Amino acid sequence: MTEPRIETEQDATRPLRDDIRFLGGVLGDTIRDHEGPEVFDLIERVRIEAFRVRREEVGRSAVAEMLRGVDIAVALPLIRAFSYFVLLANLAEDIQRDRRRAVHVAAGEPPQDSSLAATYRKLDAAALDAAAVADLLSDALVSPVITAHPTETRRRTVFDAQTRITELMRARQRATDPAERAALESRIRRQVLSLWRTALIRLARLRIQDEIAVGLRYYELTLFDVIPAINAEVRAALRARWPGADLLARPILRPGSWIGGDRDGNPYVTAEVVRHAATQAAGVALRRYLAELVELAKTLSLSARLVPVTPRVAELAAAGYPDPATHGDEPYRRALHHIRVRLSATADRVLDAPVPEAVAEPDAQPYAGPREFLDDLDAIDASLRASGDGLLADDRLAALRHAVETFGFHLQGLDMRQNSEVHEQVVAELLAWAGVHPAYGDLPEDARVELLAAELRTRRPLLGPHARLSEQAAKEVGIVRAAKQVVDTFGPEAVPNYIISMCTSVSDMLEAALLLKEGGLLDPGAPEGSPSCTVNIVPLFETIEDLGAGAATLAAALEVPVYRELVAAAGMRQEVMLGYSDSNKDGGYLAANWALYRAELDLVEVARKTGIRLRLFHGRGGTVGRGGGRSYDAILAQPAGAVRGALRLTEQGEVIAAKYAEPGAAHRNLESLIAGTLESTLLDVEGLGADAEPAYELMDELAALARAAYARLVHETPGFVEYFRQSTPVAEVGDLNIGSRPASRKPTNSVSDLRAIPWVMAWSQARVMLPGWYGTGAALEEWVGGDPGRLARLTDLYRRWPFFRTVLSNLAQVMAKSDLDIAARYAELVDDAALRDQIFGMIREEHARTLRMHAAITGHDQLLADNRSLAESIHNRFPYLEPLNQMQVELLRRLRSGDDSELVKRGILLTMNGLATALRNSG
């Protein structure tokens, strides 16, 4: 008997290599056929030379020398070629990941840590008390919030083509018949040709209406099916484990969106845009419900001669088709027709465009809300089960019921957001117009709070119908009133939160409350009763100082009686948002991460003392410099008590497509969010025990050292901003047309006023990745000070503490994508040689220092030693990154030397697109 053959790593990756070779060959054939042999030969020579550079057979300048002075007419197809090479390689890697996952499942291996199956095993082993579980999950919510942060560089057209090629490659993988495989390969060739003939970059900036449509598209692709299915699965699994506890009365996964409601720095968000965003979202839900009713009627053809129905279904059936002979003995079809008529009338009432799936009948009664609609579906479910036909109820009908329970008529909660500075200006104007106070802005904080609290107690509006306001104030009031219209139409879940960015004080929170009152969303409760608000007032703490003061700000707000009453009316729930991007830009990677952790510890303590239920909203970006990294690990890295069954987090830019464009990926990512939330809530994942306080004090010291090191470069080195502008393509980021929002909050040369996305994206393009690591090495080295005992303490924390381990793991991921030899080429673009040598010297020294300290603490000589698949992926991308970076430097040099032709500018934008694709993140 022969021993079973053990699969080697070479065996495991062979299908990936074969796919990349096949797709690269198809692209190469396409380029040769349509661009000519000379262009193709140059691309091949550059590609081969890049591989030789990776193998260290030639120096780093080899590719740069080949591209120096290349004609722009040749440079453009070369850039496009490498951009498409890496796009197709990404596609092949995604297929390989699914392929390997299927192999592991088939082999009966233990479930992955971030899966619900693994979480259930951990919960089972913990023998948890049902009452404790019920209390901790009483307000359970996991809410991914899609935002329009402009970091997705791919056009939707390119994304769609990539999706089609992926589907064809999967079919090719399954095909066993040679003729079928050949036919599929022909179709792939056609798709690659179409892709090659498609423009990679947008000619015009995205409008906010486009962003709304893009965000909603993910519901049609995956979310509408996947989210309700996971909700049902999790509820069933938890109730089976704790049958005595009525767990998850509401669906745990409830998605949100900022697109159309986030006006912080985006002048294009108006009252009409708010209404448009909500109506378009509702249209997605209602159209899908109507289509599902049509399909459901096809399957529920049960005859009254064979199956009895409940009186409620008989009543619905009697109200069905006007002609009693139509489906006369098919009560479920008649009942579903009646439901469809009522839902059609609902769509006609709330949407601004006709719905193809609707069926109009005179005098049809719209549903008052989704609960009425769900009651009718529940009646059909109950009738089927009563007659022993529950199997039929468990298919499409169950899926539809779960969807309605999750999405209602609103589909997603639309968050509103505005900067506290704008609130202050608008409130000052309203108070002056109403004669309440002529100069609110001159008042000290305590006087502001007293005045605002008094205004929140009165029913008297500040504005009459003939009020004359500035354009800004009129727009802000109009937007809040539009939100009230949305709530009146679709229910309070349609606009659940109002976020105050750059929140620094209690008055910032009360100013937002006053605007909500003026818009009709906050009821003062006077003269009797307590105030209430349909919208959660959510302070967003963003800078390191504001994060440090956030708990004190919240505690002070809760001491204001009227605000405390608003929180009480919301079930004692208070949401707080934490900003990852600006805190990082403000204080650097390590200091920002610790400021966020410390803020959470302090907020949890305020919640404990004041008796509120704290819910945290994490404003994470796609890159490590903006809070990115694996969501599951990030959730487990939260302090004890910070999750407590509820979590919201932003999903931005290119991350949305990576996570939610394909059903399998969407299911895995949403599972991981719930898995992390359940584990962080129900298990002791911090792992520090009695060592927690000493560890926190140690991190206080490290964070202070890291912030000082970061500040010495970014905030204190004269000429740093000029170095940044000359050594990166930050000036060109705004020309990528990847979002509706301006790149800066205001015209400025200040780092603090630059938005986080161009800040991170520019360093990423230049392969420095500075926001994801700078200052960490200096802090670690100075704190250790050559003391082996101190180094051992850090190693112990790395092994035991998820927070510290995640910080170093994410740092390793971003440093693995950095390349200081390439960065040196960008530094050569700086005119001032002394400035260049000084700042790049500081960057290079800190980079080396950080690598040394990471290796010393983790025991890994190489970055990503504990994540070989990611390390291999980054290594394999080198031959695509090298030409794109070298070409970008070449074109930036031409542009800054006076060649401002449209072709040169287009070439730079193409390289930016290609590099973002190759690095699998942008901003």
Swiss-Prot record:
It catalyses: oxaloacetate + phosphate = phosphoenolpyruvate + hydrogencarbonate. Belongs to the PEPCase type 1 family. GO terms for cellular component: cytosol. It comes from the Bacteria. SUPFAM superfamilies: Phosphoenolpyruvate/pyruvate domain. The active site is at residues 149, 585. The lineage of its organism: Bacteria, Bacillati, Actinomycetota, Actinomycetes, Mycobacteriales. Gene3D superfamilies: Phosphoenolpyruvate/pyruvate domain. Its EC number is 4.1.1.31. It is an enzyme of class 4 (lyase). Forms oxaloacetate, a four-carbon dicarboxylic acid source for the tricarboxylic acid cycle. PANTHER family: PHOSPHOENOLPYRUVATE CARBOXYLASE. Keywords: Carbon dioxide fixation, Lyase, Magnesium. GO terms for biological process: carbon fixation; oxaloacetate metabolic process; tricarboxylic acid cycle. It comes from Nocardia farcinica (strain IFM 10152). InterPro entries: PEP_COase, PEP_COase_bac/pln-type, PEP_COase_Lys_AS, PEPCASE_His_AS, Pyrv/PenolPyrv_kinase-like_dom. Its cofactor is Mg(2+). GO terms for molecular function: magnesium ion binding; phosphoenolpyruvate carboxylase activity. This is Phosphoenolpyruvate carboxylase.
